């Protein structure tokens, strides 16, 4: 009454549904993970009780709200994976694991934790690299899959990390060298360098750290 107006909604059918004790519906759906063209319905809801013809329509928004976002993210991930597969086939000589080619970094830009988990879950169908680390145990538990087979996170710096270390060191070289030799000597990591003079890092600082880079047991992504 307070939301839609007094007497607009008849609450008696809701009470009858509660008394019935179950949802009298039948749901049919495409197999999970199936790829279909635009315009193909993914699921259908049918009422199975003559007194509750209104129920499928009432449930449609709830189900659609839960499904559309991970489906879109899975489709985007699959589209990128097709591009990766095409150009890896053209340019790579060895059998590189293509599932490691790209990662998603949308965690902070999502509408909340639940949305971030859904987005990364869709992404992890095509790639293993994700910055939404909570999605890895989430998918592992949901699909009863070993967590090591779902995906992995990566060590990545942040702009504030680079800036605060510049403030402490007084230069751009010291912290990069520290990451290579002290913090992550045996771990691949991503280094956010656009907080610094990016081209100075690429053209001057990194060449000065050539020996440290070659001795580093892993990849440094700039």
Segments (PLM) and residue ranges:
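Buried, small/hydrophobic-residue-enriched core segments of structured protein domains
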Residues: 3, 8-9, 15-24, 33-36, ...
């Amino acid at each position: 009454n307070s939301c839609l107006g007094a007497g607009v909604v008849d609450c008696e059918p809701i009470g009858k549904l509660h008394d019935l004790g179950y949802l009298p519906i039948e749901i049919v759906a495409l197999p999970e993970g199936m790829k279909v063209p635009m315009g193909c319905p993914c699921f259908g809801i049918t009422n199975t009780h003559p007194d509750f013809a209104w129920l499928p329509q009432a449930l449609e928004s709830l189900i659609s709200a839960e499904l559309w976002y991970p489906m879109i993210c899975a489709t985007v991930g699959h589209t990128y994976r097709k591009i990766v597969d095409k150009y890896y086939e053209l340019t790579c000589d060895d059998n590189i694991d293509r599932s490691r080619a790209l990662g998603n970094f949308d965690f902070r830009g999502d509408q909340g934790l639940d949305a971030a988990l859904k987005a990364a879950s869709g992404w992890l169908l095509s790639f293993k690299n994700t910055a939404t680390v909570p999605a890895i145990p989430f998918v592992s538990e949901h699909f009863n899959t070993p967590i090591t087979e779902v995906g992995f996170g990566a060590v990545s710096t942040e702009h504030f990390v680079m800036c605060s270390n510049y403030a402490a060191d007084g230069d751009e070289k010291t912290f990069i060298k520290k990451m290579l030799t002290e913090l992550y000597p045996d771990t691949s990591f991503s280094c956010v360098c656009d907080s610094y003079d990016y081209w100075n890092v690429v053209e001057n600082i990194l060449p000065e750290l050539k020996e440290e880079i070659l001795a580093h047991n892993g990849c440094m992504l700039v």
